[in-house]
Amino acid sequence: MTFTLNHFDLDAFIDATLAEDLGDKGDITSAAVIPAEARFTGVMDSREAIVVAGLPLAEAFFRTLDPDVVVERLVGEGDKAEVGSDLLRVSGRARALLTAERSALNIVQHLSGIATLTRRYVDAIEGTGAILLDTRKTIPGLRVLEKYATRMGGAQNHRMGLWDAAMIKDNHVAVAGSVGEAVQRAVAAGIERIIVEVDRLDQIHPALEAGATHLLLDNMDAPMLREAVGLVAGRVPTEASGGVTLETIRAKAETGVTYISVGRITQSAPAADIGLDFESA
């Protein structure tokens, strides 16, 4: 299996997750109850309609504990799966499969939950031309995986961290003294991608004049967003952000903004209802 993500050590993640579960004694239940030579076949299935994400990670958990395991992925990453759909079939040593079961399920449930909610937001703005972005509102240590899940749901990734673009927010402006001064300092530092958060229309011109390359229009209602987009006049991409819900996102998308960023797709996504049942091989 090949599954790689930039800025993410998959092996370290798998090892740390299993170590958390196994402690110093290992899976004492499976060791006591399951014969060492026993073999199982299991099927992971969806108990609700979902968008799938994370099956390669489930495979990695099983393969770490049983290098000879046979894994068959029955759907693709980013695919829609209806209620009762089989997602993955796994056959191997029973003890290893039972030991890895919870870790494999946890990550697929979590990432598929994010992908599923993301797809709902993407579908809500279909046809408007606006693009859904995720945010840095992620669980510490899981950002790369959660942003992978939003891509499977149809969103695009915003900044991966503080290192890949400048984002000048209200607290930066408060210290710098003004929007224009904050942007000028970022330009002077040689930063090429400068995102500037504005929450008033009178901040737009100073931000653009100073060298902003992207404007984040924060907590603006649809009429104000439309006016802001008109003032920007296509000079840089625009992004609506702040308090966006499934009920409000389409009206904001129809104002002509380039992007809409939504923290809820990672911060508030419920785990997908996915199960895994085993039987003797």
What role is predicted for each listed range?
Residues 2-210, 223-231, 237-239, 246, ...:
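Acidic/glycine-rich phosphate/pyrophosphate-binding loops and surrounding catalytic core
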